[in-house]
Amino acid sequence: MSCNGCRVLRKGCSETCILRPCLQWIESAESQGHATVFVAKFFGRAGLMSFISSVPELQRPALFQSLLFEACGRTVNPVNGAVGMLWTRNWHVCQAAVETVLRGGTLRPISDLLESPSLMISCDESSEIWHQDVSRNQTHHCRFSTSRSTTEMKDSLVNRKRLKSDSDLDLQVNHGLTLTAPAVPVPFLPPSSFCKVVKGDRPGSPSEESVTTSCWENGMRGDNKQKRNKGEKKLLNLFV
């Protein structure tokens, strides 16, 4: 035999029905049907079955009761629901709405609850507390950012000092090396071919111009051998 919930929802019921244990706390069969229809209209049939199947079997009756109170509270007070009525000490209104639903009655929003000054004060207080928490978190974040930036600045200063000390040490080492080994001028030594001296006591010695030409010829002898391979003409001595 199908349970009262599956009967009003027009769905098949079995021995493993997940809706049957949720309605055991309601005494009459008609009240079980009214509660099931009201919750299913508010949350949707698929949503109701999804909520019930997502919790263990022992917690399903309490879940269905919570859904029923929340649906009645949102219908009577759409702004704050059952939690708002509990906060403003109007829980008896929510209980009366549940009893009305179990009897098969209809609910409508109550304007007195929406314009309740105590509810507005409570909302303002909660908003103020939330703003204080947000500002506190922002201050904490700013402190963390400041400390982090200070640490980064200190690290950069240390790195700069380290680089400066390394550069100073490098300059000192290079400066010391240049001072400890002073440069000694080295005389220029021409090749041996240019250092050959032609004495003038040799018989048949040529004139000064001839000696200069012969020295230049001896100095360029190596270059002429390379140029000869390239097809250039040999320099002739016209004063011999």
Swiss-Prot record:
Region feature (Disordered) = 200-233
Occurrences of domain LOB (ranges): 1-107
Quote any Pfam family the record assigns. LOB
Entry comment describing in which tissues the protein is expressed: Expressed in young shoots, roots, stems, leaves and flowers.
Q: Where is the composition biased (Polar residues)?
A: 207-216
Family the UniProt entry places it in: Belongs to the LOB domain-containing protein family.
What is this protein identified as?
LOB domain-containing protein 39
Query: Gene encoding it?
Result: LBD39
